[in-house]
Amino acid sequence: MKGLSGSRSHHHGITCEAACDSLSHHSDHKPYLLSPVDHHPADHPYYTQRNSFQAECVGPFSDPLASSTFPRRHYTSQQELKDESALVPRTLATKANRLPTNLLDQFERQLPLSRDGYHTLQYKRTAVEHRSDSPGRIRHLVHSVQKLFTKSHSLEGPSKGSVNGGKASPDESQTLRYGKRSKSKERRSESKARSNASNASPTSPSWWSSDDNLDGDMCLYHTPSGVMTMGRCPDRSASQYFMEAYNTISEQAVKASRSNNDIKCSTCANLPVTLDAPLLKKSAWSSTLTVSRAREVYQKASVNMDQAMVKSEACQQERSCQYLQVPQDEWSGYTPRGKDDEIPCRRMRSGSYIKAMGDEDSGDSDTSPKPSPKVAARRESYLKATQPSLTELTTLKISNEHSPKLQIRSHSYLRAVSEVSINRSLDSLDPAGLLTSPKFRSRNESYMRAMSTISQVSEMEVNGQFESVCESVFSELESQAVEALDLPLPGCFRMRSHSYVRAIEKGCSQDDECVSLRSSSPPRTTTTVRTIQSSTGVIKLSSAVEVSSCITTYKKTPPPVPPRTTTKPFISITAQSSTESAQDAYMDGQGQRGDMISQSGLSNSTESLDSMKALTAAIEAANAQIHGPASQHMGSNAAAVTTTTTIATVTTEDRKKDFKKNRCLSIGIQVDDAEEPEKMAESKTSNKFQSVGVQVEEEKCFRRFTRSNSVTTAVQADLDFHDNLENSLESIEDNSCPGPMARQFSRDASTSTVSIQGSGNHYHACAADDDFDTDFDPSILPPPDPWIDSITEDPLEAVQRSVCHRDGHWFLKLLQAERDRMEGWCKLMEREERENNLPEDILGKIRTAVGSAQLLMAQKFYQFRELCEENLNPNAHPRPTSQDLAGFWDMLQLSIENISMKFDELHQLKANNWKQMDPLDKKERRAPPPVPKKPAKGPAPLIRERSLESSQRQEARKRLMAAKRAASVRQNSATESAESIEIYIPEAQTRL
């Protein structure tokens, strides 16, 4: 009798009628055709032991609300009372069992609409159901249901599905079919007739009736079902469903139930039930039934235990729990809104362990009364798999001290996972293999959810998972229904897309070992790259389950001293993505990362290799292998990736020492965040939620970038060279204003945001060998310092300075550094002009230099600032690229050099105590004969100065041409570079 409906779920009590011996008096009753005028007086033998409710229970039978049959439920205006006992005469049930189906239909059609007499067990559904069970009670109910389900099916297994444990006689095959609620025409027509009769009165609350309590031999033995609720009491939701069964129990009922192996119900007999009784809590119950006795009751052949009690108990949960989303037509045999369509008698069959076998063709069909041999074999293997759990559960005493978490621990989550080889042979059972195998995402998670959700629901108050448990316990082979309820649990069983894990293992399997070796600098902490699976299941019925899934790197932010790099890797990760990548691109909070480390080998149900995963994996691998991710800390927010870059104030000597030994290539995924130059020396986390893209973030910004043709925005990579760094650091040491100059070398993490658009994008982060002289980063060098005589620049330095491929942030910082330097010069010269009594020619030079600098800052610097802001504005049209900014900056350098030369001359004059020329030099100039040489006296130094200035300009032009050549060579050789990180992301990556 697997077909008990949901509304019948509220009676689990031991039969409380004292007149158990009076059953023989009514064995001669015709079970269906009693007179409608039988008013069931108070001295009726079935109602001899009523309580104080009895006077209110009896009502006129013309009233449809009161015209229920035995056992009935009466509803008063003050409080709705439940007057049910599951006691049905065994002889009467046996007679009803043997009646043919067509005769049952005739009996039902002959009945009036008042449906009086002993026709069937009728239960009234309230119009507005108050579903107020607490989650703790729900967990308790679910745990009870799970154990009943496990035991009943373990008894079914050896007898090939017979509910009577091997005693299924030919007589009872019809009962078996009825218990299964098969899709036969008789049952459907009968249910339809019942539905039409039940819903004839639209004003009254809907009635439903079922003959299933009269179907089998076990109707007398509904009592174990009430006992094996394991100490539950009908608390809050049962305020309108007080059970007479508990307060009218007598010694005879206890004796009758002790024939079922001494089930003790002492506390049930003392339970006070009155109209004003307070709601009973679980602490008021102390059932002395142990699970071992429950198993004996189940295994006793006279009990004839089958699925009806599992159904009756679990359907109470379905009735009282408002979270169940399973359609009522699938659960109960009635239509709640009185529609005339056919009542679906098919249940969601309770063999979800067959679902767990992953068998698509599912050898057990609804219409077949006997399961196939395949299903029988599966049930036997299921019995083997679950027997250790049952054995351990026999020692567990269920009382008010045991919480559901404690009760379920004995067949724990791991055992449920490891014993789920139901459609596979037991010898091939390997829990690790099951967990890591992509084939594991078959239907065996249905059973595993049934075993594991109960243990996990106490940790997670996700009421939707209760729905998954009920579906798993009571559904048989409903592929569509189970798939609709296919909720991913934190166990993360599905292993569909592990290619990113394999790619990481192939591409950077050495990283975790090599990082600690390469990070050999004493200040650095050991940096490890971990792949962390974060998942939060958003439970949505009959829709796609959204699961946040990502790979983040979990590491500490180290000091900025770069480690020593021995080799440069070639990392190429090609990630074929599925179309589900949009919902995976979000990351969970950082709080989950610590406890999710244990699941790092698992993936979610909607796991796919989207761009975030592949790019993060490859880029973090590159970080770890090239220099360790010294400059960034990958965090995760709800919709963005944040990067913390540590820019510490390191002395120039330390930098010079480190940069001579190292080349630091750091690539990261980050978001836009503008940082002021004053804060460049401190760690700062960028928290703006903008479009997340792939781009290269350089630790000390001694790099250069390249852009692939297929990428819409620049994906940048850097190179730095120690010889070039030496020169730049020497110039910094000799610089008179080392503060803003040193600031140019400390680049923060806020590089531009690069969106991933289109499919088939290639991102190249390229590096070159040391002998590739044309690939130098120009922006690492300070602006030209012609006022310092000790600096002599070679063409390579010119190339390095000229080529610049930065974004707007970087050029704004350079521009600010130049402005600060020039303003410092202007203030210095103006102060010298005020403090010293200088000759007019020197004053003229000072005013010329200061005016030129101010004009340059007011005009060209302002124009360049606007260009940088347009570059940072994604809506600007036309939007200057980084290469445009680099070219404009190179032209700006020429003007900066001219002004620098003027200030250099002023510095020389100041060093000479503001004296114009050395007298010795003047004497040498006057040495030629006076008459022919007089016209050339004055302009001679001027001509020499102009020639020097023109030579400087020619050198600057040469540097600019060399820079352009280097840029073209670098772009052509980007893909043929000696070291590259290539990430190929095809398909479905346009939704970031």
From Swiss-Prot:
Q: How is it modified after translation?
A: Ubiquitinated by TRIM3; leading to proteasomal degradation.
**Gene Ontology MF, one:** protein-containing complex binding
Comp. bias intervals (Low complexity) = 194-209
How is expression of this protein distributed across tissues? Highest levels in the neocortex, part of the hippocampus, the granule cell layer of the cerebellum, the glomerular layer of the olfactory bulb, the inner plexiform layer of the retina, the ventral and dorsal horn of the spinal cord, the neuromuscular junction and the submandibular ganglion.
Localization terms from the record: Cell membrane; Postsynaptic density; Synapse
Which residues are modified to Phosphoserine? 169, 362, 365, 368, 372, 389, 418, 421, 425, 428, 437, 509, 516, 578, 581, 605, 608, 611, 947
Q: How does it sit in the membrane?
A: Peripheral membrane protein
The record ties this protein, via InterPro entries, to: SAPAP
Name the Gene Ontology biological process terms: chemical synaptic transmission
Sites where Phosphothreonine occurs are at T579, T606
Q: Which UniProt keywords apply?
A: Cell membrane, Membrane, Phosphoprotein, Synapse, Ubl conjugation
| Renumbered ranges of motif PDZ-binding | 990-992
Positions of the UniProt region annotated as Disordered: 150-209, 355-376, 914-980
The superkingdom of the source organism is Eukaryota
Q: Where is this region: Interaction with DYL2?
A: 665-676, 687-698
Polar residues bias: where? 969-978
What cellular component GO annotations does this protein have? plasma membrane; postsynaptic density; synapse
Composition bias, kind Basic and acidic residues: at what positions?
918-927, 943-958
Family according to the record: Belongs to the SAPAP family.
Q: How does it assemble?
A: Interacts with the guanylate kinase-like domain of DLG1, DLG2, DLG3, DLG4 and AIP1. Interacts with the PDZ domain of SHANK1, SHANK2 and SHANK3. Found in a complex with DLG4 and SHANK1, SHANK2 or SHANK3. Found in a complex with DLG4 and BEGAIN. Interacts with DYL2 and LRFN1. Interacts with MPP2 (via the SH3-Guanylate kinase-like sub-module).
Q: What does this protein do, in the record's words?
A: Part of the postsynaptic scaffold in neuronal cells.
Q: What is this protein called?
A: Disks large-associated protein 1
